[in-house]
Amino acid sequence: MIWVAVVITMLLFILVAKPTGIYLEKAFQGSKKLDKVFGPFEKLIFKITGVKEYNQTWKQYALSLVLLNGFMIVVVYFIFRLQGVLPLNPAHIEGMEPTLAFNTAISFMADTNLQHYSGENGLSYLSQLIGITFLMFAAPATTLALVMAFIRGLAGKELGNFFIDFTRALTRVFLPIAFMAALVFVALGVPQTLDGAVTAQTIDGAKQSILRGPVASFVAIKELGNNGGGFFGANSTHPFENPGQMSNILQMMLMMLLPTALPFTYGRMVGNKKQGRILFVSLFMVFLLGFITITTSELNGNPALNAMGIEHVQGSTEGKEVRFGTVFSSLYATVTTAAETGAVNTMHDTLTPIGGLVPLVNMMLNTVYGGVGAGFVNIIMYAIIAVFISGLMVGRTPEFLGKKIEGKEMKLIAVTILFHPLLILGFSALALSTSLGTDAISHSGFHGLTQVVYEYTSSAANNGSGFEGLGDNTPFWNITTGLVMFLGRYFSLITMLAVAASLKEKTVVPETVGTFRTDNGLFGGIFIGTIVIVGALTFFPMLVLGPIAEFLTLK
């Protein structure tokens, strides 16, 4: 029965992808019906804020994005610092420590949601609503706006205006869908209140304080926007965030909704629907392989316990919620790292070595399917690399969407693809070379190395999940992961927008018999191979020293 539920869940991922992709294309490219519904409200916003409707250059678009995001980071930083004297603080929570406020503000603006604090004890309701929830809308709206400009550039059209795209992302996508999802979560038992903690009497007569809050609205945008941060420290293992299997499936659907839709949006916007389908199918195959790997490893149980003759019919149950079970915990772990959300319904630090390898690889690749917007930019980056390699093999100038891929584009892509592992491995080396980093490690040996690398991988990929055995709420970890999150977020977005702008200016080369097609199974295979060879092999030495070595040791 559990496998039937898994198949149905995956079919739901597939069934909603195309309709959502079509809706996104209409939402951003203009639809009379949508303009009639949302247009008056959007025009009012533009009038109040003074936004002028004109097309920006890629530099203007990128500058607008960075300045607006930077302003939001500063505002939310001071909300965190001053929350102790601000209203909506029934628990009388003190202001955040400076480096923790720095880390948290960047974390949520970068759509990472790395949490070095416990949600219910670290933030007031005002901070949760005005700080955290606000950024949970603004962060994915930023990248959804950018990916639309990116696709327009690839299609040879004007990039558009960041502020208009940003507003449409909020009004036409995130606000309506999150509102409906929040109502469903309330119906499924997720609380939504501004009242303080309630005192309950336990069976043995003791009194217990049960924390609550505006959780349903928080969880809706947490999953839809690929944010991942928890209202409670236990994240989606907490029964108030994720009461049962229905809420669990809904959360996974929300996580996958926009990332899986974007290939179809892309296909419609560039006039090559078949290429969009090929990208979707190729990535789903990689996703499926990851799920099979982690599930097989977790169902085989803990090798150390197996050697003692302990029954393991349910697999490795350490760190997992009984109401979800091993299979759905494995699926959730695959989804949350494939879609770069970072929400967890099981503790990733307790996964088996190969089980923990899958989330780590998903984040290192950062492209299966990746987070809202930013993930799809990485997908196209790998697609262009695949075309470039194929062109070199047959002695032709590589072409993508009829545009020649030349030195300028490949230099930008080369720098972008090297920057991600440089952040992860460079800062991991720094942490391992000083006691400021190693003092946080709770396990020695191979697992300890994996804890460190997982933290920086999660930060660079804007995922936010963690091997929570790491004692990371220290100035060193707050500052270094904050820097990694900021650089990992904005560097690749800007460089790839420059690539799209460069391709926009090029003339379309007529298709000939020798043109390498990017809308068939051959390209799909080369695309997957490129992801594995260029992406995975970059990190292979580290994976051997971490989870693979731990697996071999346990065996």
Curated annotation (Swiss-Prot):
Keywords: Cell membrane, Ion transport, Membrane, Potassium, Potassium transport, Transmembrane, Transmembrane helix, Transport. GO terms for cellular component: plasma membrane. InterPro entries: KdpA. It is found in: Cell membrane. One of its GO terms (molecular function) is P-type potassium transmembrane transporter activity. It comes from the Bacteria. Pfam families: KdpA. The chain crosses the membrane at residues 2-22, 60-80, 130-150, 173-193, 246-266, 278-298, 374-394, 412-432, 483-503, 525-545. The keyword Lipoprotein does not apply. Its main location: membrane. It is a multi-pass membrane protein. The system is composed of three essential subunits: KdpA, KdpB and KdpC. Belongs to the KdpA family. Part of the high-affinity ATP-driven potassium transport (or Kdp) system, which catalyzes the hydrolysis of ATP coupled with the electrogenic transport of potassium into the cytoplasm. This subunit binds the extracellular potassium ions and delivers the ions to the membrane domain of KdpB through an intramembrane tunnel. This is Potassium-transporting ATPase potassium-binding subunit. It comes from Bacillus anthracis. The gene is kdpA.
